[in-house]
Amino acid sequence: MKLTAKEQERLTVFTAAEVARRRKERGVPLNHPEAVAYISDWCIERGRDGQSVAEIRSGASKLLGREDVMDGVPEMIDMIQVEPVFPDGTKLVTVHDPIRSDSVGSADDETTESEAATDGGDSAGTDE
């Protein structure tokens, strides 16, 4: 099997995210790389499913709360940027302050209109 550098990176993120999912299910607090991979993988998969950039940004900030990660991790992650492949091409998704004290909830809930604000320049609509 021959993989491009981008495909290898994607598999690395997926593998780290899978470790993070298993640890989270067991109640083990996630470290920095696990938390970033967990959120990044979720964003990438939602892009592939065709969700909008705004929906992904909104949902991603609800995935992990402070109680899900080790002490100090929220302060280390002020922003996560990923480039999911959407049905119409690759776009940049930026999630600011992805781990919030009030963030625990279901990210699969419907996004309200106020949460689904404009991209704010986060989409780079380039095809790959």
Curated annotation (Swiss-Prot):
Gene3D superfamilies per the UniProt record, alphabetical: Urease, gamma-like subunit
Region named Disordered: 97-128
One Pfam family from the record: Urease_gamma
Gene Ontology, cellular component aspect: cytoplasm
GO MF annotation, one: urease activity
Domain of life where this protein originates: Archaea
Pathway assigned to this chain's UniProt record: Nitrogen metabolism; urea degradation; CO(2) and NH(3) from urea (urease route): step 1/1
Record carries keyword Hydrolase: yes
Catalytic activity: urea + 2 H2O + H(+) = hydrogencarbonate + 2 NH4(+)
EC number assigned by the record: 3.5.1.5
GO BP terms in the entry: urea catabolic process
Keywords, comma-separated and alphabetical: Cytoplasm, Hydrolase, Plasmid
Main location class: cytoplasm
Compartments, as annotated in UniProt: Cytoplasm
InterPro entries reported in the protein's UniProt record: Urease_gamma, Urease_gamma/gamma-beta_su, Urease_gamma_sf, Urease_subunit
The keyword Hydrolase appears for this protein: yes
Known partners and oligomeric status: Heterotrimer of UreA (gamma), UreB (beta) and UreC (alpha) subunits. Three heterotrimers associate to form the active enzyme.
Classification via HAMAP family: Urease_gamma
UniProt record similarity statement: Belongs to the urease gamma subunit family.
Protein name: Urease subunit gamma
Originating species: Haloarcula marismortui (strain ATCC 43049 / DSM 3752 / JCM 8966 / VKM B-1809) (Halobacterium marismortui)
Lineage start: Archaea, Methanobacteriati, Methanobacteriota, Stenosarchaea group, Halobacteria
Gene name in the database record: ureA
